[in-house]
Amino acid sequence: MGGRHRVTAFSLLTLVLLLWLVSGRSCGQPLRKCAGNKPCQSPRPPVVLVPGDLGNQLEAKLDKPSVVHYICYKKTDTFFTLWLNLEQLVPVAIDCWMDNIRLIYNRTTHTTSSPPGVNITVPGFGQTYSLEYLDPSKRSVGMYFFNIAQALVDWGYTRGDDVRGAPYDWRKAPNENKDYFLALQQMIEEMATNAGRPVVLIAHSMGNMYMLYFLNQQPQAWKDKYIKAFIALGAPWAGVAKTLRVITSGDNNGIPVIRPLKIRSQQRTAVSTSWLLPYSHTWPKDKVLIQTPTTNYTVMDYQRLYSDLDFKDGWLMRQDTESLLFDLTPPGVAVHCLYGSGIPTSEAFQYTSKFPDVDPTVVMGDGDGTVNLLSATQCKRWVRRQKQSVTLQELPGNEHVNMLLNVSTVAYIKKVLF
């Protein structure tokens, strides 16, 4: 009996060692070494998924000196989901949520911070779960990058290995997320080294602005070595008109239980909102974007608009961020620019004498329901400004978020990868 057990134990140990050698793994990462101790080339390029505004989970831990309502938690022992948590987006509870997720702008440092006693983190950097589903319960209403991530898995990719997510604090603009870009650079270099080939970036919405900023900071030699292509989905290259409504009278994003004016104060604190106002390098300087009985506002009138809204912090935020991508410098990598069209999209807002504390009449134009067509197609200006290819692909009838679920989008991504 004892001998048999020793033989069995030895056999199991041998099997484990063989499996370890065959798998070629060390510290959880594939070695993929070939002749000459050089990395083998993977049959497919690694992929980094980058979400847009509101496009990944946020978590919070509380130890607050006070609360806005007696039902609000003042202290928590662990981190909990702050976004997306549908249970917090209902009357009364939303007051707690707004007070936790808001930012406080410092006019001296020109930076923002969470309220006292609120610690907000971005979970799952390097993983895909926090952007596949915005709601950890995986309700369909919170489905975001799941279809694309699952398609990649079906093609042979592995979550957390050669397909990874790069979530970030989307309340802020790139100038306040320097640690994020350092972590992103290191992750891209690691993935490219492991695979023996450069990475493909797939970004959505505001995530494309983040990636353009990131690429503009990198030397061309770095981009040549580590980036194969940049797939931009629904990019607001020149800003979006919708953000004007957000800062003026609030926007409930179609959630009927939330009053736009109720959520306006919180939405204004997000620096990324002011960053994404329409830009004068693209929008006609004489086009009226906001109309009231006494005043018309164009892209040249933001200072006056913020003043009339009594929102000085907003004007400072815009000044802090407007130059980050104002020139729309080419990314210096192959770009595939996919954009939706044919969906009524907000392009101007008409207010009554109750401005700004009233819902506007919305003037519609072309786009994907969120990003105006004028903005989404600005990648065309790079066609003759960089040697790398720039491809534009219109997706008629594709809505801004639903484009991530569309078979045409998935098929296009596969064509780029393989």
Language-model segments: what does each one mean?
Residues 271-354:
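Glycine-rich, aromatic-lined ligand/substrate-binding cores of catalytic
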Residues 2-202, 206-267, 277, 284-286, ...:
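N-terminal non-catalytic accessory region
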